[in-house]
Amino acid sequence: MGKVALIERLTDGTACQGDDCAVVDAGNGLLTLLTTQTLVEGVDFDMMYTPLKHLGYKAVAVAISNIAAMNGHPRQAMVSIAVSNRYSVEALDELYAGVRLCCERYDVSLVGGDTATSRAGMVITVSVRGEVEASKVVYRHGAKTHDLVCCSGDLGSAYAGLLVLEREKVTYQANPDFQPDLDGYDYVLERFLKPEPRMDIVKKLDEAGVVPTSMTDVSRGLADSLLHLSRASRMGCEVYEERLPIDYQTSRVCSEMSKNMLPVSCALNGGEDYELLFTVDQKDYDRIKEMEGIHIIGYVTEEGMTPVMVTPQNTTITLRAQGFQGVEE
C-alpha cells in the first residue's frame, strides 16, 4: 500500500481533503492553512552526508512548500524533535540554526515545539500555519479540459544530488581514506540538501493576476504529482518530454552514473525538487508565457483520461508513479 492509499484509509470519515494542507475558514475572507512534515533519520536523511544546519533548514522548507502549493503565505512554525544521546547540545544548536535561518528567510515566526528522547536516530517534525485569501486558494482539484500544465524551476536535480552523495558514500565506506570530490556538483547538491520553497512563484503569479486552477508541489517526482492533480480533478493530461526543464548538471550526473540512466527518469520519478506543478486557464497564457522560472509543459485533456508523456519520437507513454510512496496502491 502506498503513502496516499494509507492516508486515505486512516483518515476515512474525517474532514481531511487530501490536499497539501488542511484548510480552515478563519473568517474575514481568509483561510487558515495547516500542514505537518516529518523527516526520519535513515529514511528521509542520512547523517553521513547531511549537515545539521542544512537539515534544519530543509525540514522547515519542505513544510513551507505545502503552503506555497495552495497559493498561501506561511506565518508561524512549530518544530519538534526526538533525538538519541549521540547528539550533543552543540549539534542541536546547529540544527536549530538552520531552522531559524529558513524561518527568517520566509518571514515565519518560530512559536514553539517539543523535544523527546529517541532510542535510535533523529526524528524532526515541522508544523506550519499559513494564510490565503479565500478567493485565491488553490486545491489539487479544479483543472479543466484545455488548461495549460506548468511547472516551476527544473526537475530531477535533487535526485541527481542524492545520486552523487550516495556514490561518494559507497566509495568512502569501501576506503575510509578516500576524500570525496564534490567539485562541479554544487547546484545539484544544494537542490537536495537545501531546497527552497517556491514562494517567489506564488508572488509572481499573484502580481500577474493569475490564480492557478489546480496546484501541488513536486515532492516525489513529476509523474506522481501529475497523477495527484489528475486524480483529484478527474482529468487526464498530456505533457511533452522535450518541454520538461532539466538542468545540464542533472544530465551530466546521469551520464556519469550509467549509460542507461535517462535525465527524464530523474525528472519523472526522482523527487524532492519541491517545485510547483500547476494548471492555468488558457486565457492566462499571455500573462505567463514569458514569466521567468515557469515552463508550460503540456495541457489538460478529457475527463476520465490518464496522464501521458509524448516523446520526441511522438510515442505516447502512460505515466505511473515509479518511486517509493507513490500515489498508486
Short names for language-model regions:
Residues 1-6, 86-109, 117-124, 129, ...:
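Glycine-/charge-enriched secondary-structure boundary and capping motifs
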Residues 179-228:
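Polyanion-binding loop/helix "lid" in catalytic or ligand-binding cores
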Residues 39, 75-168, 299:
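Glycine-rich anion-binding loops of enzyme active sites
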Residues 30, 133-138, 285-286:
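Short helix-loop capping/hinge motifs at secondary-structure junctions, enriched
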Residues 40-49, 131-132, 182-188, 209, ...:
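Glycine/charged-rich beta-loop-alpha catalytic/anionic-binding loops adjacent to active sites
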Residues 15, 47-62, 86-97, 135:
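Glycine-rich anion/phosphate-binding loops
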Residues 1-51, 70, 79, 97-98, ...:
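Extreme N-terminal cap/leader segments of soluble proteins
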Residues 161-178, 182:
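Short, compositionally biased
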